[in-house]
Amino acid sequence: TQKGDTLYGGFYTQNEVKDIVAYAQARGIEVIPEIDMPGHSLSAIACYPWLGCGANNQWADFSSPLCLGNDRVLQFCRDVWTELFNLFPSPYVHIGGDEVDMVFWKNCPRCLARMKSNRLADGHALQAWFTNNMQAFFTAHGKRMIGWDEMLDGGHMPSATVMWWRGGNADAAVRATRAGNDVVCCPTTHFYYDYVENDIDVEKILCFDVPAAMTSVDRQHVLGLQGNLWTEHIPSFNRLTY
């Protein structure tokens, strides 16, 4: 971390997670877990350096990825989710898949070997290979996968639900619906509520519409909207309502 950064984080015990899920259920709210993979993994890599590609196992870029050429890493991912299956009854799980810093894979012998053996052209294809493997794992456990729109950059993800967040990339939402994926709209331009109020006001939110390029058939795959409030700098409910 850099000097002046805000300390945030913490953890939940299994009993605390169960309490949250039960509290939400009693109020008609479904809690869906997200463990971002293969990017946004620096916290795990800092604790377990073998999860990374070697060069990214220290505190650096938050989006440092897991080493996808290491079979032990793949088992780690399955083990993490297996524990969560017992805590969250929701049929949905969110794998993240956004903001992956692929430069580490380009310099990792294991990842390069994985790409060669599976005839994967680039980092996007390697991520797609990983995500498809995880989707098969989720399906085998009766779960449906959700991910951010970058996960489609390496190719189609059958049956995945896509969260379109890149406001400057409306084509991502159009491509997803056209491929038959269900989409939740939450672009930064309208639905990132940790942004300053000058950037997003109520009128702009209420005037949101899906990309004009979507046909009537495409629009049938739009499940709805989501407001995102990232809480790194929101330590309390009072700050949330500020």
Regions found by a protein language model. Name each.
Residues T1, T6, T13, T82, ...:
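Residue-identity detector for threonine
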